[in-house]
């Protein structure tokens, strides 16, 4: 009997161990299944780092947006609707006043203007060169809805005249700024004539309208420059009163834009910031952007 009892106890212990081992094996299988399921699910998205674009430039998301119903990602990136990319940054202007044309003295030389002599509450935006062609310019011009004059250099634009054609179609007026962007001051008559007349002729061929105004590179000119501008059929040489670069407006006189001032900026990397800064300076002075060509007969 004693042997039988001991044998029964050993059998019971053995059966208990088998049950424990089976339970452990089931737990391990469950853990492996859970791990496999976790690795098959989408990885957690890491938040994108802040944009390195210059301020003022619209940045479209690199990640597709979710549909309103909470479904899968849409096929295209989420972009602002047309006409709203710069909403909130562009000042609003009313219609400019009916222009009062200035008196241009007669003679054998073109007048030299850095300001239009007018009491009307207007200022003029001019943009030079054309080396850097920011894609935002077209939408910016459309949204702002203000007149601008582009003084273009042939060598800067000849690789992509279609870019400037689109700006012209949006309302910009194209003027001349030489072929090669060399300083004209002190150069021979023949050199200046080639640069001044040649640039106007080529721009007329490219864009269907010959320029009526001219700006020498760096604002540098001499008596020959003004004489050749006149001989080439253009009405005036242009300088400026304010410049804009990297979103900062710099004034030659005082700390505000004055009625009739000509503002200079360039086609640069910070084009958006510069253009908006020019508009904000005009608005802060209580003025309205107007078209330069409307004031020069």
Predicted regions and their residues:
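Bacterial N-terminal signal peptides that target proteins for export
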Residues: 2-12
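N-terminal low-complexity, Pro/Thr-rich disordered segments
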Residues: 12, 25-114
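C-terminal motif of bacterial Sec signal peptides marking the signal peptidase cleavage site
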Residues: 20-23
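CE4/NodB-like, metal-dependent polysaccharide N-deacetylase domain
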Residues: 27-29, 142, 147-149, 173, ...
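Active-site beta->alpha N-cap acidic-glycine motif
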Residues: 83-176, 180-183, 202
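Structural recognition of the beta-strand scaffold that forms the well-ordered cores
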Residues: 123-127, 148-152, 173-176, 212-215, ...
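Acidic-and-aromatic substrate-binding clefts and catalytic sites of carbohydrate-active enzymes
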Residues: 130-133, 152-160, 183-189, 215-221, ...
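His/Asp/Glu-enriched short active-site or ligand-binding loop at hydrolase and phosphoryl-transfer sites
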Residues: 210, 220-256, 289-296
């Amino acid at each position: 009997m004693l042997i039988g009892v001991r044998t029964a106890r050993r059998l019971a212990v053995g059966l208990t161990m088998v049950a424990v081992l089976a339970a452990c094996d089931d737990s391990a299988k469950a853990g492996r299944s859970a791990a496999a399921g976790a690795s098959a699910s989408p990885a957690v998205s890491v938040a994108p780092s802040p944009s390195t674009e210059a301020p003022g430039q619209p940045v479209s998301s690199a990640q597709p947006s979710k549909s309103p119903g909470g479904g899968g990602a849409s096929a295209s990136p989420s972009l602002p609707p047309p006409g709203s990319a710069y909403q909130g940054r562009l000042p609003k202007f009313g219609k400019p006043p009916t222009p009062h044309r200035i008196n241009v003295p007669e003679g054998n030389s073109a007048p030299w203007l850095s300001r239009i002599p007018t009491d009307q509450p207007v200022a003029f935006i001019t943009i030079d060169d054309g080396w850097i062609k920011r894609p935002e310019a077209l939408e910016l011009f459309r949204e702002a809805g203000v007149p601008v004059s582009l003084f273009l250099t042939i060598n800067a634009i000849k690789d992509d005249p279609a870019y400037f054609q689109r700006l012209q179609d949006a309302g910009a007026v194209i003027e001349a700024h030489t072929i090669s962007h060399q300083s004209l001051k002190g150069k021979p008559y023949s050199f200046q004539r080639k640069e001044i007349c040649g640039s106007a002729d080529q721009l007329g061929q490219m864009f269907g309208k010959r320029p009526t105004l001219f700006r020498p590179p760096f604002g540098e000119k001499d008596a020959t420059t003004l004489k050749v501008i006149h001989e080439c059929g253009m009405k005036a040489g242009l300088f400026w009163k304010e410049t804009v670069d990297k979103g900062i407006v710099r004034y030659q006189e005082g700390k505000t834009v004055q009625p009739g001032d000509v503002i200079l900026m360039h086609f640069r990397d910070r084009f958006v910031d510069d253009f908006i800064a020019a508009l904000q300076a005009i608005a802060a002075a209580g003025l309205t952007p107007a078209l330069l060509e409307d004031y020069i007969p």
